[in-house]
Amino acid sequence: MIDSLNTLVPMVVEQTARGERAYDIYSRLLKERVVFLVGPVEDHMANLVVAQLLFLESENPDKDIHLYINSPGGSVTAGLSIYDTMQFIKPDVSTLCVGQAASMGAVLLAGGAGGKRHCLPHSRLLIHQPLGGFQGQATDIDIHAREILLVRERLNHILAKHTGQPIEKIQHDTDRDYFMSATESLAYGLVDSVLKQRAEISL
């Protein structure tokens, strides 16, 4: 999934009626409807995640998909393409934070199906306003400034929708970096449970 780590991805060998078959670990887990969102959110990674979500929907539109997130965030447009696909497809998308879900990663974690958003005990979550920079003529800078304010408003409304927090609180909290522990994110409404053991979740 991440080019720089391709040589480090372990292979799994399975015995089939036709002999042995080797999978990389991510492809094997995809058979179990597990999708990994790891590292910075950018266009290539987002396209891979979207493609996997659409594939799993076509395989079985009535069975949950499990999205595991360990991400520092990244591109808003790339992240929103994943978010929109999660809302668009028929299967529920269960989200689970392992490590961190920061910025756009936190938005995607919160965007999972209600009652099916989880994190592990030592997860770290971060919400904040979108970052951006632009150089050019004053008029163009003004155009981009207005656009990033619209993006901030859109993201705040998404967080308010999924957390149940008032939009005013979301606006206040995202004005600066707002870190949360697993238990704090549960109280905030970003997740529905903090998991400690495998028995608490099916996958």
From Swiss-Prot:
Keywords: Cytoplasm, Hydrolase, Protease, Serine protease. SUPFAM superfamilies: ClpP/crotonase. It catalyses: Hydrolysis of proteins to small peptides in the presence of ATP and magnesium. alpha-casein is the usual test substrate. In the absence of ATP, only oligopeptides shorter than five residues are hydrolyzed (such as succinyl-Leu-Tyr-|-NHMec, and Leu-Tyr-Leu-|-Tyr-Trp, in which cleavage of the -Tyr-|-Leu- and -Tyr-|-Trp bonds also occurs). Its main location: cytoplasm. The keyword Nucleus does not apply. The keyword Lipoprotein does not apply. The active site is at 103 (nucleophile), 128. It is found in: Cytoplasm. GO terms for cellular component: cytoplasm; endopeptidase Clp complex. Pfam families: CLP_protease. Cleaves peptides in various proteins in a process that requires ATP hydrolysis. Has a chymotrypsin-like activity. Plays a major role in the degradation of misfolded proteins. Fourteen ClpP subunits assemble into 2 heptameric rings which stack back to back to give a disk-like structure with a central cavity, resembling the structure of eukaryotic proteasomes. Belongs to the peptidase S14 family. This is ATP-dependent Clp protease proteolytic subunit. It comes from Nitrosococcus oceani (strain ATCC 19707 / BCRC 17464 / JCM 30415 / NCIMB 11848 / C-107). The gene is clpP.
